[in-house]
Amino acid sequence: MALSEAAVKVQAALQERGLETPMLPNVFTPEERKDKIEFHMKEILTLMSLDLSDDSLADTPRRIAKMYVDEIFSGLDYENFPKITVIDNKMGFDEMVRVQDISLTSTCEHHLVTIDGTATIAYIPRKKIIGLSKINRIVRFFSQRPQVQERLTQQVLVALQTLLETKDVAVKMDAVHYCVKSRGVMDSTSSTTTTALGGIFKSNPATRAEFLNQSK
């Protein structure tokens, strides 16, 4: 299936800036990927001395394969990039548009455990206005990959800048990393905040402060 125009533009913009997720060319169909993941997951679980003949575990390798391809890593495939509705700003709206408390669930690319948090996004319209739900969908698309939070924040920023044809975009993410919470240091209370600011949000102290102060 051919990629949408929006997907092509966003992917090219990320590659140009060195912000694309490290990926190899995709040479397998989704079903082929599921079959290969299932095969290797059986080996992994067996090496961990789990009995896959037990009815509770028998379908686990296939469940994991489907979850990886269709759900938590579906953002690795630009065929899954959301359909984007962008309209001309005929009304001349030039004040901040802000969407906050966007839920995000991603996966740490170092240990493949959960990143759970929220995003706040703002932009100042110039030529284009985007459908509000599309902002949430873009966050979800880039979250559905193995990620580091810093890159995820930047990817969402560049995607919106590209689609809206303006630098005036701001992204803030607050998340709990289960690679910190459930293993290693096992800190159950800390969270991580990242920001990516573009255009007037970066250059104008008052606009930056307005965004960050309202994001608390």
UniProtKB/Swiss-Prot annotation:
InterPro entries: GTP-CH-I_C/QueF, GTP-CH-I_N, GTP_CycHdrlase_I, GTP_CycHdrlase_I_CS, GTP_CycHdrlase_I_dom. Pathway: Cofactor biosynthesis; 7,8-dihydroneopterin triphosphate biosynthesis; 7,8-dihydroneopterin triphosphate from GTP: step 1/1. Zn(2+) binds at C108, H111, C179. GO terms for biological process: one-carbon metabolic process; tetrahydrobiopterin biosynthetic process; tetrahydrofolate biosynthetic process. It is an enzyme of class 3 (hydrolase). Its EC number is 3.5.4.16. Keywords: GTP-binding, Hydrolase, Metal-binding, Nucleotide-binding, One-carbon metabolism, Zinc. It catalyses: GTP + H2O = 7,8-dihydroneopterin 3'-triphosphate + formate + H(+). The keyword Cell membrane does not apply. Pfam families: GTP_cyclohydroI. One of its GO terms (molecular function) is GTP binding. SUPFAM superfamilies: Tetrahydrobiopterin biosynthesis enzymes-like. GO terms for cellular component: cytoplasm. Belongs to the GTP cyclohydrolase I family. Toroid-shaped homodecamer, composed of two pentamers of five dimers. This is GTP cyclohydrolase 1. It comes from Shewanella sp. (strain ANA-3). The gene is folE.
